[in-house]
Amino acid sequence: MLRYLADDTETTVIGAYVEGVPDGRGFYEGLAAAAAKKPVIIHKAGRTQAGARSAASHTAALAGTAELWSTVLKQAGAHEARNQEQLLDLMLGADMLPSSGGRNIAIVGGGGGRSVQSADAAEENGFTVVPLPDDVRRRVREKAPGLADWVGNPVDQSILAGSGLSSNGLLELMLESAAYDLAIANVGEDWFFGRPDASDRLKHACNRLAQICETSAKPVAVVL
């Protein structure tokens, strides 16, 4: 099935829920062949001892350890999803986002906690959260002099208030820099959605981000 989907011109992303495989070598070879052609995302269930016992009871297939599976997927060039929700999210992202051509990432928006969590998630998944480069800092100083020495990557949206530079404006500056290959744009915090004008503000923010995504040659993942 993996080889068929790899050659199918109508399939852009391959995703699979796997409990175990009867032929480990055959699975690896098919996985590597497919991953060489298009994104492949695997959710391996039965990673714990209890889960593996349950999987074996109705598949009679090789389950393997979590570490072994992670290594196999990485060597084959596939991506690992930790649960079914992440599997679907990764498949959707791989289908909609163009290839970045690099791993240097800009992270904009959200409060301090959310921006820190985004940075952790990015680096834990192999991206580099590059500090704000001099070319971007110079442009920030032109637009918001008082902000230039404070802002960094990830961008804590709370420090932008009253600066004259919006998070979307800063996102555009970062995307125009050769220092970054892609970006994450965080939209809103819990308190934001409790505002009486939250719907209108959210619509405006999303429309503006859509414009940025359309005009940028670099991928932008928007997180609501």
Q: What are these model-predicted stretches?
A:
Residues 1-224:
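Catalytic-core regions of core metabolic enzymes
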